[in-house]
Amino acid sequence: MKKFVAVLALSLVAISATGASAATKVTLTPQNKVSKKNPVITVKLSGLPTTHGIYLSQCMAPKVKGEAPTACNPAPASKLWVSAVEADQKMGATAPTGKVTIKVDKYFKDGDCVHTKCIIYVTNDHNAADDRSEDQFIPFKFDGLLPF
């Protein structure tokens, strides 16, 4: 009976640990008609992790589904570190409240968002770098350009 209770307890811990890792909800505005003259996307976040932050980056969509992107925009305005953790904010992370924006480019080193699919890549920050549970690939496109 003791073994049964121990196994049951471990099972419940495992179930609750996996169920608690829901991904952050990320909404981009605009998503399908980003202005070529003012290429700024407003990012709305909810369900952010409470123990670490996330990174958002403009990248080329990965060639193989499920893999991390290999070409991301190196411009500082095209990357964001967002965290609800106060210590992270003191080190430069953006608070997830209010207006969070990211500037995107049609072209960047090793990237072409005019002729190929680009994404906002969401991933856990350096405090949870091995945890892939937040990885998201959110497509966007510029106004008047190729439909995806």
Question: Model-found features: residue ranges?
Answer:
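Secretory targeting and sorting signals
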Residues: 1-22
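Extended, solvent-exposed regions of the mature portions of secreted/cell-surface glycoproteins
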Residues: 22-148
